[in-house]
Amino acid sequence: MMCLTPSQFLERRACFMSVMMHTAQHQTCIDACNACLQACEHCLTACLNEPDVQARVRCIQLLRDCADICSLASQFMSRDSSYAKQICNVCATICDACAAECGKFKDEHCQKCANLCKKCADECRKMAA
């Protein structure tokens, strides 16, 4: 076990508290990214089981991209990365594209996913501003 001097302890505590404060500020966006990620994964699985799966190829591709970028954005914000804003800008762009594509399909899973993608894009734009 490593012992810290009082000044080292205070320095590390201040650093930890700073990260926690930044994470709390980004929590709404992190939550939106996580909800979008989950919706994309669910929608992807459902689309693969639809009878018109061939018509959904672009949607499926975007769902994969959207789920991945939402996960990455959530991770970058959680660790207070200096690149979080750039990742969130990309996330907003991909979420917008995914929302537009999912919106073309009338089934419940695509409509729900489109709505959550729009919310995520909005939160990511706010975070990146």
Ranges and model annotations:
Residues M2-A129:
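Amphipathic alpha-helical hairpins
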